Structure formats: structure tokens, C-alpha cells
From Swiss-Prot:
GO terms for cellular component: mitochondrion; nucleus. Keywords: Mitochondrion. One of its GO terms (biological process) is response to oxidative stress. It comes from Cyberlindnera jadinii. It is found in: Mitochondrion. Residues 43-176 form the TLDc domain. May be involved in protection from oxidative damage. Belongs to the OXR1 family. Its main location: mitochondrion. Residues 1-26 are annotated as: Disordered. PANTHER family: MUSTARD, ISOFORM V, NUCLEOLAR PROTEIN 7/ESTROGEN RECEPTOR COACTIVATOR-RELATED. This is Oxidation resistance protein 1. PROSITE patterns: TLDC (PS51886).
Length: 176
């Protein structure tokens, strides 16, 4: 999507700039998360985390407001083949990006954005491009509240974009 603004013509270069305001795009539409079953206890993706991730996605992905859960360890079981099957696009023209979210034992989260669906490749072939990135987040809050068992109230988010040092982005195998 492109936005254009007509430039006002000034009678001379020394004339005062016009009072026409510059275009300010509206705030993004909030992200809606769907796909979790009602019984799912460990919902790793929150709307707050999704908004942090959306801010660094390529522009064509930022406009998407409905994010659908493709695979959950809790809902679909611990199977790499199931993950690959669930991610496979319905058509070859389906160009979705995917976000992987993992929670560690310290309740921090990390993951990645990949611009292609995960699938095993032969002969150690890598795929993906420089749009892919890694990220991590940790809930931060008042230290006293955390010590007292209260819930932290802010996510500290950090992204690690593609460096261009090599093209080894995504590699998947069914050998596990």
C-alpha cells in the first residue's frame, strides 16, 4: 500500500512552508489470535508479544491482523512430522510467514520468524532469506512484586535480525 500527498507549489523558494499537515497513518489494527482450543493452558503467544513481533516483520506481514495457531505441542503432540504437516501450505502460492514461540524453564520466551514453511530438505540444503530473524522476550516487573509472587507487568523484547554473514537461514531434517 502506498500513500501519496500532493506537494503544494510555492511561489518562490524563499516562501514560507505551507501549513498542510503531513499524513500520519492510523494506528495498526490490533492482532487477533485464534486456533487455541478452550482447554489449552499454555498459550505462549500473547497479543502484547504479537505486537512486539509485528513491529519488526516485513511490511507485507504487518498488515495482517488475524494470526492463526498452526501447531502447539500441547494441542498436537510432540511430533516433528506433525509440525511439518501442519505448516505445509494449502497451495504453492500461499506465502505466509511463521513465528515459532518457545518457553524455557525460567518462563522466558524466544523464537524466530521464518518467511517459508518448515519442511525437511535433502543434502543439507538451507532455505529462507534475510527477512528471517530471531527474537527473545522476558517478563519484567517490579522486583518486589516478583519476590512476593506477583505477576510481572512488562515484556522486555529484543530482536536479532539477519546479519548477511552467510545464507544459512533455515535447515530442517526428519532425521530426529
Amino acid at each position: 500500500m502506498s500513500f501519496f500527498k500532493r506537494k503544494s507549489k510555492s511561489p518562490s523558494p524563499s516562501a514560507q512552508p505551507s501549513n498542510i499537515d503531513t499524513y500520519v497513518p492510523p494506528p495498526p489494527i490490533p492482532i487477533e489470535l485464534d486456533g487455541y482450543s478452550q482447554t489449552t493452558k499454555n498459550r505462549l503467544m500473547s497479543t502484547e508479544l504479537a505486537e512486539d513481533i509485528r513491529n519488526i516483520l516485513p511490511m507485507r506481514y504487518q498488515v495482517r491482523t488475524n494470526w492463526h495457531l498452526v501447531y502447539s505441542l500441547e494441542q498436537h503432540g510432540a511430533s516433528l512430522h506433525t509440525l511439518y504437516r501442519m505448516m505445509k501450505p494449502l497451495t504453492r502460492y500461499d506465502k505466509n510467514g511463521y513465528i515459532l514461540v518457545i518457553r524455557d524453564l525460567k518462563n522466558s520466551q524466544f523464537g524466530c520468524f521464518v518467511n517459508e514453511y518448515l519442511h525437511p530438505t535433502d543434502l543439507r540444503r538451507f532455505y529462507g532469506n534475510g527477512e528471517c530473524f530471531l527474537w527473545k522476550s522476558k517478563r519484567q516487573g517490579d522486583d518486589v512484586a516478583e519476590e512476593m509472587g506477583g505477576e510481572a507487568n512488562h515484556i522486555q523484547f529484543k530482536a536479532f535480525p539477519y546479519t548477511g554473514l552467510n545464507d544459512f537461514i533455515i535447515y530442517c531434517t526428519s532425521e530426529f
